Amino acid sequence: MKNKLPPFIEIYRALIATPSISATEEALDQSNADLITLLADWFKDLGFNVEVQPVPGTRNKFNMLASCGQGAGGLLLAGHTDTVPFDDGRWTRDPFTLTEHDGKLYGLGTADMKGFFAFILDALRDVDVTKLKKPLYILATADEETSMAGARYFAETTALRPDCAIIGEPTSLQPVRAHKGHISNAIRIQGQSGHSSDPARGVNAIELMHDAIGHILQLRDNLKERYHYDAFTVPYPTLNLGHIHGGDASNRICACCELHMDIRPLPGMTLNELNGLLNDALAPVSERWPGRLTVDELHPPIPGYECPPNHQLVEVVEKLLGAKTEVVNYCTEAPFIQTLCPTLVLGPGSINQAHQPDEYLETRFIKPTRELITQVIHHFCWH
C-alpha cells in the first residue's frame, strides 16, 4: 500500500545508509542484496511485480526489475545500485548518513546515483499504476562502477522491448543522447632475461615495447584523422598510454614489460573494429617477435552509445525541459540498455560530484526531478 511508503527524505536516508560499494578489490567489494531488498519491498508496496535476478560472475550481486501494466512497449526507468569506494580521510561527514546542509544532501550515492530511486518512488505516490495503458518498468542494476555486469546481463537475457528508457545518472537534468565508449587493454611483452654485459644473449622487453609504442602512437594519429563526431568537445577517438612497467634492475636485460592503455571510441565504432585496428597496428612487432606480444582486456569493454536525435523520446524530453540534448565523454550503462530500446541519460545532481569526497545533491533538483518523472510516465504510459 502507498501509505506504507516512507516520506521522500526517509527513503533517501535509508538508501544512503545501506552500503553497496562495488570494487575490483575483493576486500572493498560489497553485495547489494540489502539495497535490492529495500527497493523490492517499496515497489511491491506500490503494486509492482518484482523480479530479483542474481548476476553471474559477481560477488553476490543482484538486479531488480519492478514492472506494472500490461502489453508491449512502455517506459523503462533505470539506474545502478552500487557506489564507488570512499576515502574516509577526505570525507568530513559520515558517507552513510544523509546530511542536509545549506541546500545540499550529502552522502555516498546521493548524486551517483541511489538518490534517483528515491525520486522515482516519491513520484509514484501520485500515480495510479492500475490505470497505466502501457507498462512501466524500474530497473536497478549491479556493478556499474566496475564491470557493468548487471546491465550487460539484463540486456543479454531480457525479452523486454520498451518504447524507450531513461537512465537517471547525474546530468544536472540536462538530457544526454550520446557518449563515447571505453576500451582498456594491457600490452604485455615477454623478453628473455640475461646479464646486461652481453645483450645478445637476451631479448630486451623494454626495447620491444618501445617499438610497439611507436606503432600504437601511429594508431592514435590515424584514429584522430579518420573518425570525427563534431558534437563532442573532443571530436575524435582518444588513445591514452596510462601506465608502464618493465624490468627490475639496471644490470639485467628486461624480461617483461607491460603497458596499460585505453581507447575511447565514438558512437558507431564497433568493438571488433577497434580490436582489429589495434591488432593490425601491433602486427609488425608480433611478426618480428612471434609469441612475445599479447593483448588482454583490463576491463570488459564498453561501446559508444547514441540515441537517434529525431526519436520521439528526444523530442518529448527536450520539450518538457526546454533544453536540447547533449553528448558527453564519460560512460554509462546506456550502450547496453540501448540494445533494447532508444535510451536517454537524464537525472538529478551533477556529474562533477560523482566519485568525490563529501558527495552531494543540491535540493533545488528535488521539485523539477519529481515533476519530470511524473510527466514522462504520463506521456509514455498513459497516452
Curated annotation (Swiss-Prot):
EC number(s) given by UniProt? 3.5.1.16
Q: Reaction catalysed?
A: N(2)-acetyl-L-ornithine + H2O = L-ornithine + acetate
Q: Which SUPFAM superfamilies match?
A: Bacterial exopeptidase dimerisation domain (SSF55031), Zn-dependent exopeptidases (SSF53187)
GO MF: acetylornithine deacetylase activity; zinc ion binding
Query: What are the subcellular locations of this protein?
Result: Cytoplasm
The record, for Pfam families, names:
M20_dimer, Peptidase_M20
Q: Quick one: which residues bind Zn(2+) 2?
A: 112, 145, 355
Which residues does UniProt mark as catalytic? 82, 144
Record flagged with keyword Metal-binding: yes
Question: What are the names of the required cofactors?
Answer: Zn(2+); Co(2+); glutathione
Cofactor annotation remark: Binds 2 Zn(2+) or Co(2+) ions per subunit.
Q: Where does it sit, as one GO cellular component term?
A: cytoplasm
Keywords of this entry: Amino-acid biosynthesis, Arginine biosynthesis, Cobalt, Cytoplasm, Hydrolase, Metal-binding, Zinc
Read off the InterPro entries from this record: AcOrn-deacetyl, ArgE/DapE_CS, Bact_exopeptidase_dim_dom, Peptidase_M20, Peptidase_M20_dimer, Peptidase_M20A
Entry's Gene Ontology BP terms: L-arginine biosynthetic process
Q: Out of the domains of life, which is the source?
A: Bacteria
| The protein's annotated pathway | Amino-acid biosynthesis; L-arginine biosynthesis; L-ornithine from N(2)-acetyl-L-ornithine (linear): step 1/1
Binding of Zn(2+) 1: at which residues?
80, 112, 169
Query: What is the role of this chain?
Result: Catalyzes the hydrolysis of the amide bond of N(2)-acetylated L-amino acids. Cleaves the acetyl group from N-acetyl-L-ornithine to form L-ornithine, an intermediate in L-arginine biosynthesis pathway, and a branchpoint in the synthesis of polyamines.
**Would you identify the family this protein belongs to, as annotated?**
Belongs to the peptidase M20A family. ArgE subfamily.
Its quaternary structure?
A: Homodimer.
Q: What is this protein called?
A: Acetylornithine deacetylase
Q: Which organism is it from?
A: Escherichia coli O17:K52:H18 (strain UMN026 / ExPEC)
**What would be the name of the gene that encodes this protein?**
argE
